[in-house]
Swiss-Prot record:
One record GO biological process: glycerol metabolic process
Stated name of the protein: Putative glycerol transporter Lin0367
UniProt lineage: Bacteria, Bacillati, Bacillota, Bacilli, Bacillales
Broad class of where this protein is predominantly found: membrane
GO cellular component terms, semicolon-separated: membrane
Transmembrane parts of this sequence: 3-23, 30-50, 63-83, 92-112
Keywords of the record: Glycerol metabolism, Membrane, Transmembrane, Transmembrane helix, Transport
Domain of life: Bacteria
UniProt-annotated location(s): Membrane
Species: Listeria innocua serovar 6a (strain ATCC BAA-680 / CLIP 11262)
InterPro entries, per database record: DUF6905
Upregulation: Repressed by GolR.
Annotated membrane topology: Multi-pass membrane protein
Length: 113
C-alpha cells in the first residue's frame, strides 16, 4: 500500500464521523425526526459512495476482511464526545451493545458471504 492510498484511506475513515458530527444534529434540530431520516440517507449514502461505491474510492480494501463504516463512526463520535466533556462511564452500556451487535452482525454475514 502506497503512502497516497494510506492517506486516502485515513481521510475516508475520518470523513464519516466528521460529517455525522457536523450535520446530523443540525438536520434533526431543523427538521425534527424526518431530519434524522434525511441525515441517515444523505450522510451515510454520500460518504459510502465516496468511500466504496465509485471506481477510484477513498478507502482501499486490501483483502477479504472488511471493516464497516460504523466502526469509523463509532470511534470518531465516541472520541469527539469524550473530548467535549462526555463521561466514559455513561457510555459503557452502549459500547457493550455495539460490540455485541457488531459480533452478531458479522456472524450473520459470515453465514452467506
Amino acid at each position: 500500500m502506497s503512502i497516497g492510498i494510506a492517506l486516502a484511506t485515513i481521510a475516508g475513515g475520518f470523513l464519516f464521523p466528521f460529517a455525522i458530527r457536523m450535520m446530523w444534529g443540525k438536520m434533526v434540530d431543523e427538521w425534527g425526526a424526518i431530519g434524522g431520516w434525511m441525515a441517515a440517507a444523505f450522510i451515510v449514502g454520500t460518504v459510502w459512495t465516496i468511500n466504496h461505491g465509485i471506481p477510484k474510492s477513498m478507502i482501499y480494501q486490501s483483502g477479504t476482511v472488511w471493516v464497516d463504516m460504523a466502526v469509523a463512526a463509532g470511534i470518531g463520535v465516541f472520541t469527539a464526545s469524550l473530548l467535549t466533556g462526555g463521561k466514559f462511564s455513561k457510555s459503557v452500556v452502549n459500547l457493550a451493545a455495539a460490540v455485541v451487535g457488531g459480533v452478531l452482525g458479522g456472524f450473520l454475514l459470515s453465514l452467506f458471504l
